[in-house]
Amino acid sequence: MRQFLSSDRINSEIPQEKSEMVGFSDIDNSSRQIKEMEAAFRSAVKTGQIPGAVIMARDHSGRLNYTRCFGARTVVRDECNRLPPMQVDTPCRLASATKLLTTIMALQCVERGLVRLDETVDRLLPDLSAMKVLEGFDAAGEPKMRERKGKITLKHLLTHTSGLSYVFLHPLLREYMAKGHLQTAEKFGIQSRLAPPAVNDPGAEWIYGANLDWTGKLVERATGLDLEQYLQENICAPLNITDMTFKLQQRPDLLARRADQTHRNKADGRLRYDDSVYFRSDGDECFGGQGVFSGPESYMKVVHSLLQRDGRLLRPETVDLMFQPALDAQTEKQMNQHMDASPHINYGGPMPMVLRRSFGLGGMIALEDLDGQKWRRKGCLTFGGGPNIVWVMLLSALRFVFFFFFFFFFCSS
């Protein structure tokens, strides 16, 4: 039987943090800032604000190599009555941090001539091409659908400008489901993610949605491979990664030590184990937008390969393309207005709201510098995942990857 720990019980049983730190003496003012950051994380674990975290940083030269693990990977004690520590190889549900991996897989297909960025998806995703746009509902409550204006391209999918949205984020789709036009998924199923209709035309606006789940299907159809097989052969094998997978339930060695999902109870502020189906099962197919489990160190290998432009995953010129703003002026303005009006969502990670932002192939891009506590530099690419996973990458400076596992942005109770 699982035994549960409240936040005040965590304090006396916190696993010792582990660290590796090389090269910070070469960075002005970093020593004090790093100590302050580490103290903040130690305090957050001790007071039960978070169960555990992993923080990593690398630079392109290899001189900077920083890793620090804090706390535990769960609030549930093991059979020895201990809290198992959070480690760099702890398998973690990446959620939307999966989107970077699927973007890389799609761009590999582009490099190999299997698809073009500006090619319509008609050939590989005819089911998406046939999808109509939901405009609203008539007096009888029936959905009003219209034909899509324009064609969806791979670039639209990679930049969230295809006209698709997640059900939980869009009022029309929430009403569409409430009226019985979508079935509530009883399990973690791909069709429930791909079934909702579009809510706008391609290129009309930035909308966060199931674009990378569809991109994963595009990669499968372009290559003839299951996305898990493609991931293993084209991302994991080149980087010697052995703990990254869509199929955690088929890997008992990883399943036994994965990070648990937790949420914060609003009534008492304590962390609770969350027995979410999303965290204890695999999808019926591979979700390109949210389906991967990985250890932090393995995810770091991926982003560090991009940072080094080493050609093992993508050509240097393709990596450079990822860092170029991909939205036109009107869509960029609309995206910024939407995000400013929805600070509680904070898509993909903590991009400060005061920054002007765009979107590239794989993440959000800062269009200006910001100093101080919310430091960012123009051109940095960032995204993450719902369980408080954040990665930030600069081609010419530090690149951080954060792994926090304590509660979903939308899931406190």
UniProtKB/Swiss-Prot annotation:
The keyword Cell membrane does not apply. The active site is at 96 (acyl-ester intermediate). It catalyses: monacolin J carboxylate + (S)-2-methylbutanoyl-[2-methylbutanoate polyketide synthase] = lovastatin carboxylate + holo-[2-methylbutanoate polyketide synthase]. Pfam families: Beta-lactamase. Monacoline K acts as an inhibitor of HMG-CoA reductase involved in cholesterogenesis. Its hypocholesterolemic activity might be useful for lowering cholesterol levels in the blood and reduce artherosclerosis and coronary heart disease. Its EC number is 2.3.1.238. The keyword Cytoplasm does not apply. One of its GO terms (molecular function) is hydrolase activity. Pathway: Polyketide biosynthesis; lovastatin biosynthesis. SUPFAM superfamilies: beta-lactamase/transpeptidase-like. 2-methylbutanoate binds at residue 386. InterPro entries: Beta-lactam-related, Beta-lactam/transpept-like, Diverse_Enzym_Activities. Keywords: Acyltransferase, Hydrolase, Transferase. Monacolin J binds at residues 93, 193, 208, 278. Induction: Expression is controlled by the monacolin K cluster transcription regulator mokH. It comes from the Eukaryota. Belongs to the class-A beta-lactamase family. PANTHER family: (LOVD), PUTATIVE (AFU_ORTHOLOGUE AFUA_5G00920)-RELATED, BETA-LACTAMASE-RELATED. Acyltransferase; part of the gene cluster that mediates the biosynthesis of monakolin K, also known as lovastatin, and which acts as a potent competitive inhibitor of HMG-CoA reductase. Monakolin K biosynthesis is performed in two stages. The first stage is catalyzed by the nonaketide synthase mokA, which belongs to type I polyketide synthases and catalyzes the iterative nine-step formation of the polyketide. This is Acyltransferase mokF. It comes from Monascus pilosus (Red mold).
